Amino acid sequence: MSDNLNMTAPGAGTGYSGDIFDRLLRERIIFLGSQVDDEIANKLCAQILLLSAEDPTRDISLYINSPGGSVTAGMAIYDTMKYSPCDIATYGMGLAASMGQFLLSGGTPGKRYALPHARIMMHQPSAGVGGTAADIAIQAEQFAQTKREMAKLIAEHTGQTFEQVTKDSDRDRWFTAEQAKEYGLVDHVITLAEGPISN
């Protein structure tokens, strides 16, 4: 994705000023198309903040095709989504796993979509631990707190109980688009007959 977040008018005769993601950004469409890490999180947060400042009344569309990644980086994106005055419509396509699933279900209620062949996977967060025994104990407590916090938020977004989410995310839990809708991870499954997706 381009580091250039310039929102200038398209170049004459081209329809856009270069990078396809810049053109999509002008249409208020942003992509999470990779593993979630700090660099990607910073870019997505900046794009959400930019679009929110530009017009706080229009929706932002976030397309997700991600295997997941860093919990802290994902939480930065999630908190920015919630901080934005704009509705954030989320679209799961390809794979929305782990933190990808979390962000998909964290979209604005009623505006969370899955494409028909998307696969969604929910599981508990994972983390490597190391260091002294005291460090490991501290990290384990932080990990347990993060696990509880994420299960609580997923329960709020899906309408499932905290206990059910905790049980279901104990191991990898895979969903088709329709199963994700039934569970409450998304609100709609987009069919090809509905035509193009736009704001």
Swiss-Prot record:
Protein location: Cytoplasm
Entry keywords, A to Z: Cytoplasm, Hydrolase, Protease, Serine protease
Catalytic activity: Hydrolysis of proteins to small peptides in the presence of ATP and magnesium. alpha-casein is the usual test substrate. In the absence of ATP, only oligopeptides shorter than five residues are hydrolyzed (such as succinyl-Leu-Tyr-|-NHMec, and Leu-Tyr-Leu-|-Tyr-Trp, in which cleavage of the -Tyr-|-Leu- and -Tyr-|-Trp bonds also occurs)
A biological process term (GO) from this entry: protein quality control for misfolded or incompletely synthesized proteins
EC number in record: 3.4.21.92
Superkingdom per UniProt: Bacteria
Pfam families in UniProt: CLP_protease
GO molecular function: ATP-dependent peptidase activity; ATPase binding; serine-type endopeptidase activity
InterPro entries on file: ClpP, ClpP/crotonase-like_dom_sf, ClpP/TepA, ClpP_His_AS
UniProt GO cellular component terms: cytoplasm; endopeptidase Clp complex
Active-site feature positions: 98, 123
Matches recorded under SUPFAM superfamilies: ClpP/crotonase (SSF52096)
Record flagged with keyword Signal: no
Main location: cytoplasm
Assembly information from the UniProt record: Fourteen ClpP subunits assemble into 2 heptameric rings which stack back to back to give a disk-like structure with a central cavity, resembling the structure of eukaryotic proteasomes.
Family: Belongs to the peptidase S14 family.
Function: Cleaves peptides in various proteins in a process that requires ATP hydrolysis. Has a chymotrypsin-like activity. Plays a major role in the degradation of misfolded proteins.
Protein's UniProt name: ATP-dependent Clp protease proteolytic subunit 2
